[in-house]
């Protein structure tokens, strides 16, 4: 959809396949960038939030459900953390969680839409937090697909894809050619991760994405959690590696250093989230 609907009673809704997902609030910004429609809202429940092309992306009071789930299984398990690549993530939340690790020496954030970054910094500053002023962060306002294609072999220890749904500028982040480039530029012992849609609202996209990543990397597994403002509230992230499912085993020292500052993630939560694969999806992937 192109823009959220706003009712007379102040509800801002996302519509998906005959179901409405809404928050009560008011629109602060609604504009069109060269890539997508960007809407910033102020809701009574989740604080300020961001929508792209009418689809909920993040909000101040529930963003940790998404960002911690994407980041920590990868960064707690990769062999090294010196160089990290984040594709998308213009709200800054993924970069913020990555930069909590002192072993990260350089983080490339590649975001195609600079207006998302500007509006997030202005209206949602708590999500990016100190990441925007961290000297280790290099913000690149470029196409993430082209960035991976042009990167040198084995140049990143962790690659995180924090993109929107597979339409518009994010469509190319879900195909085989892109995943192969990510594998090429991943260092030995590295971990790749991407958001992989809802197993309920986007069932076939989710299954196809996990299957394709597994074919490209050799090892890949979905992790399941919840993001209350997303379609169905049930979401997934898929993790991959070429040398075994290392993403399932957080390194104790890293986990101990990071978990006390987390709202959602812990080694115990992660174990359950990987094991929570529905039977019908497990059959499809076998």
From Swiss-Prot:
Belongs to the spermidine/spermine synthase family. It is found in: Cytoplasm. It catalyses: S-adenosyl 3-(methylsulfanyl)propylamine + putrescine = S-methyl-5'-thioadenosine + spermidine + H(+). Spermidine binds at residues 67, 91. Keywords: Cytoplasm, Polyamine biosynthesis, Spermidine biosynthesis, Transferase. PANTHER family: SPERMIDINE SYNTHASE (PTHR11558:SF11), SPERMIDINE/SPERMINE SYNTHASE (PTHR11558). S-methyl-5'-thioadenosine binds at residues 36, 111, 143-144, 169. This is Polyamine aminopropyltransferase. Catalyzes the irreversible transfer of a propylamine group from the amino donor S-adenosylmethioninamine (decarboxy-AdoMet) to putrescine (1,4-diaminobutane) to yield spermidine. Pfam families: Spermine_synt_N (PF17284), Spermine_synth (PF01564). Pathway: Amine and polyamine biosynthesis; spermidine biosynthesis; spermidine from putrescine: step 1/1. One of its GO terms (molecular function) is spermidine synthase activity. Its EC number is 2.5.1.16. NCBIfam families: PRK00811.1 (NF002010). It comes from Prochlorococcus marinus (strain MIT 9303). The lineage of its organism: Bacteria, Bacillati, Cyanobacteriota, Cyanophyceae, Synechococcales. The gene is speE. The active site is at 162 (proton acceptor). Homodimer or homotetramer. GO terms for cellular component: cytoplasm. One of its GO terms (biological process) is spermidine biosynthetic process. Residues 9-242 form the PABS domain. HAMAP family: Spermidine_synth (MF_00198).
């Amino acid at each position: 959809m192109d823009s959220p609907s706003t009712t007379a009673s102040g509800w801002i809704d996302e519509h998906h396949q005959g179901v409405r997902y809404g928050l009560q609030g008011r629109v602060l910004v609604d504009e069109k960038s060269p890539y997508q429609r960007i809407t910033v809202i102020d809701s009574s429940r989740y604080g300020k939030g961001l929508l792209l092309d009418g689809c909920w992306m993040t909000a101040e009071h529930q963003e940790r459900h998404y960002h911690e789930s994407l980041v920590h299984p990868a960064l707690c398990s990769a062999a090294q953390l010196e160089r990290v690549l984040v594709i998308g993530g213009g709200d800054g939340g993924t970069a913020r969680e990555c930069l909590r690790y002192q072993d990260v020496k350089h983080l490339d954030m590649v975001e195609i839409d600079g207006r998302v970054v500007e509006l997030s910094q202005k209206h949602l500053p708590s999500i990016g937090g100190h990441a925007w002023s961290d000297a280790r962060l290099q913000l690149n306002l470029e196409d993430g697909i082209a960035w991976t294609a042009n990167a040198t072999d084995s140049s990143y220890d962790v690659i995180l894809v924090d993109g929107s749904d597979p339409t518009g500028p994010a469509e190319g982040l879900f195909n085989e050619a892109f995943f192969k480039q990510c594998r090429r530029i991943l260092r030995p012992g590295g971990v790749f991760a991407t958001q992989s849609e809802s197993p309920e609202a986007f069932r076939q996209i989710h299954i196809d994405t996990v299957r394709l990543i597994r074919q490209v990397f050799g090892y890949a597994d979905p992790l399941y959690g919840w993001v209350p403002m997303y379609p169905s509230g049930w979401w997934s992230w898929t993790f991959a590696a070429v040398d075994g499912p290392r993403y399932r085993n957080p390194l104790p020292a890293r986990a101990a250093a990071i978990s006390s500052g987390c709202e959602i993630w812990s080694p115990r939560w992660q174990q359950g989230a990987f094991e929570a694969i529905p039977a019908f999806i497990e059959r499809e992937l076998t």
